[in-house]
Amino acid sequence: MASLVSLELGLLLAVLVVTATASPPAGLLSLLTSGQGALDQEALGGLLNTLADRVHCANGPCGKCLSVEDALGLGEPEGSGLPPGPVLEARYVARLSAAAVLYLSNPEGTCEDARAGLWASHADHLLALLESPKALTPGLSWLLQRMQARAAGQTPKMACVDIPQLLEEAVGAGAPGSAGGVLAALLDHVRSGSCFHALPSPQYFVDFVFQQHSSEVPMTLAELSALMQRLGVGREAHSDHSHRHRGASSRDPVPLISSSNSSSVWDTVCLSARDVMAAYGLSEQAGVTPEAWAQLSPALLQQQLSGACTSQSRPPVQDQLSQSERYLYGSLATLLICLCAVFGLLLLTCTGCRGVTHYILQTFLSLAVGAVTGDAVLHLTPKVLGLHTHSEEGLSPQPTWRLLAMLAGLYAFFLFENLFNLLLPRDPEDLEDGPCGHSSHSHGGHSHGVSLQLAPSELRQPKPPHEGSRADLVAEESPELLNPEPRRLSPELRLLPYMITLGDAVHNFADGLAVGAAFASSWKTGLATSLAVFCHELPHELGDFAALLHAGLSVRQALLLNLASALTAFAGLYVALAVGVSEESEAWILAVATGLFLYVALCDMLPAMLKVRDPRPWLLFLLHNVGLLGGWTVLLLLSLYEDDITF
């Protein structure tokens, strides 16, 4: 009987040994949770080879410093002095996983610990630290970032896992909240060749801000002021009333306070919005609530202060043009803009009707005043002061409305003066003189408004129908345009064509700079900018043509001056494409053009327009209002929606 019992015990022991040694290298997580099976020397050797391939040291490959005996030594109680067994049982998988993670995060230090016999004790210490639920996620994040710093051989195509996935796998395997289960899942992914997507802990962002900009807690007022200056916020960053973001962005950044003990792998990592939300455990579906926004703020501050995202190169723009395409498309767009000057010929299409040309020219003259003043106040002034950048930040266009109030004040006095002249009793001689108001009693036969009016006699003396050619019609309606002996003009009116041409030339040069810079960026930006320039150049050039005609120039002279000033846009275009023009230089050019426009419109065009006499004053008053309000409306819409023109 005794021999039979001994035989049964021997068979049972043999079965157990065979079971322990013959277990296949299953997943470490399933091996840990089942508590059955073991890892033999072959499986451990393969695991150690994988670990050696996944890390690199500061001076190159780390080399293989861990042996199978070191791994088997993890299966004996610390200080037992017993030799390692032939296999590593399932109950020691948690310690093996912790020890492997230590090697992946710090290969040099782990090799020294293994030689000193401290590898197992340090693995137990790591497991003890991660057992706290509050320390598990931050601890894993710290380990993964160290592993990323030491990782070798990773490619962008490798499947990456993050901490939430590791936690879910541990829960699914029946080890919720277990540090050993999470580390075993991590080691399974190491064996399968996965990479790891680590994220910093929420506290890291707060610590970064305080370590870099505060010598103590809480942060002092001076330190907060320095922090706000670096971020470009606060009163000092917006000291001038124009809120010029261009100046704030060009200011040299305040250097970070160097701290040797606060450096981290995360200091140079640029995080996406999804990464930031994941770091704080926020769901993409739920979004960011006001309460969560307060938590996210340190992360955004850290990204701004560290400059991690500023050094990354931008991806190539798909719609960028080649150098030859920039010149081709830019030249075509500028040519179309220059053809606006030729549209002045439209004024001659209605000369078949007596008196119509006079009112057409007066309408376009008022349109020129509205377009030029609107362009200077609503369009160019915001660009000069850098106020157009506010539209990119989602702010309300409040500066535009304030500038519109300036034009409203101008329009109020315009109405007051016109209504005052219309409602008061008029001199009978004004009615007899006709639409031009040429009275023999007014300054030698010419009033101050003579340049902006047509001769009265020609409007009252029609020519026979058989003499109605276009040239005759122009001469009939406005003989001073074709007469080789022009009428006598006042000195200020003789200067008006040159001032209009000079202002147009400077403005068109600046437009060419803008078009060239836009096409250098992309064809979409170039097309949008060209359309915007065309919108405000069309009424502007038509009005200028009318003003030049009324200043005593012939049709040919007015067209030549308009075309000459428009051609400067090509010079600006080629300068921008060839050498490039900075935003600051363009602002100075536009500032000079703004002053020229305001002087021409308010000191020359508007006073002369107000002194026009006509037998139908209310009709002329209506046409002047249509021109003024039309020009201002076009430029107001352009100023409000110019940045929204996209294709």
Curated annotation (Swiss-Prot):
Main location: membrane
Post-translational modification comment from the UniProt entry: The extracellular N-terminal ectodomain is cleaved when cells are Zn(2+) deficient, N-terminally cleaved SLC39A4 is internalized at a faster rate. Under excess Zn(2+) conditions, SLC39A4 on the cell surface is rapidly endocytosed, ubiquitinated and degraded.
Family: Belongs to the ZIP transporter (TC 2.A.5) family.
Effect of P200L: In AEZ; Loss of zinc transport activity. Decreases location at cell membrane. Retained in the ER
Extracellular domain ranges by topology: 23-327, 381-402, 519-526, 580-586, 639-647
Disease entry from the Swiss-Prot or TrEMBL record: Acrodermatitis enteropathica, zinc-deficiency type: A rare autosomal recessive disease caused by the inability to absorb sufficient zinc. The clinical features are growth retardation, immune-system dysfunction, alopecia, severe dermatitis, diarrhea and occasionally mental disorders.
Disulphides: C57-C62, C65-C111, C160-C195, C270-C309
GO biological process terms on file: cellular response to zinc ion starvation; intracellular monoatomic cation homeostasis; intracellular zinc ion homeostasis; zinc ion import across plasma membrane; zinc ion transmembrane transport
Annotated phenotype, changing E537K: Strong reduction of zinc transport activity
GO CC annotation terms, alphabetical: apical plasma membrane; cytoplasmic vesicle; plasma membrane; recycling endosome membrane
Protein's recorded name: Zinc transporter ZIP4
Tissue-level expression: Highly expressed in kidney, small intestine, stomach, colon, jejunum and duodenum.
Gene that specifies this protein: SLC39A4
Effect of D375A: Reduces zinc transport activity
InterPro entries hit by this protein: ZIP, ZIP4_12_EF-hand, ZIP4_N, ZIP_Transporter
pH-linked activity: Optimum pH is 5.
GO MF annotation list: identical protein binding; metal ion binding; monoatomic cation:bicarbonate symporter activity; zinc ion binding; zinc ion sensor activity; zinc ion sequestering activity; zinc ion transmembrane transporter activity
Domain of life: Eukaryota
